[in-house]
């Protein structure tokens, strides 16, 4: 059986490799492995998300962190951020924590199915949601996210237009104070929803 990147305990054979990623004016080396999302490089959607963000402050949650490029690169760019990275995938969480530390970034890396093991409030939550898990799963994540945002806190998501960005925007507008598209690039929409 093949593992999905949102499998909690991947059983696929390890295939560890090192890649270099440049974004936000910083460059970092990352270890990746089989059984995690986009193990060969920073995926286009995540790059679009990263490059569309305003300057960030406070406490940040990288929800569905994978091998940790978002939290690590943001931590390198904004060293005063308090960063929590989470993923349902145990292999991804281990890689994310190691990658952050190897690049001099202090983070808390937590294995969690959405918010199951996440405590506290966040000023910013970022996610490239697991589209293949289905609309019910990702909309549930979006709804639960609001309860973990400070007043005025922001959720940033990246989603392909053809994979449901218009309906996700509509849903977010119905449940958040505001929601808007802040970037459209290469078929991806970056949506910011404010609690």
Question: What do these predicted ranges mean?
Answer:
Residues 87-90, 137, 160:
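Short beta->alpha hinge that forms the Motif I/post-I loop of the SAM-binding pocket
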Residues 139-151:
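A short glycine-rich, Lys/Arg-flanked "PGG" loop and its adjoining helix->strand segment in the class I
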Residues 152-160:
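Conserved beta-strand signature within the Rossmann-like core of class I S-adenosyl-L-methionine
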Residues 184-195:
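Core SAM-dependent methyltransferase catalytic element
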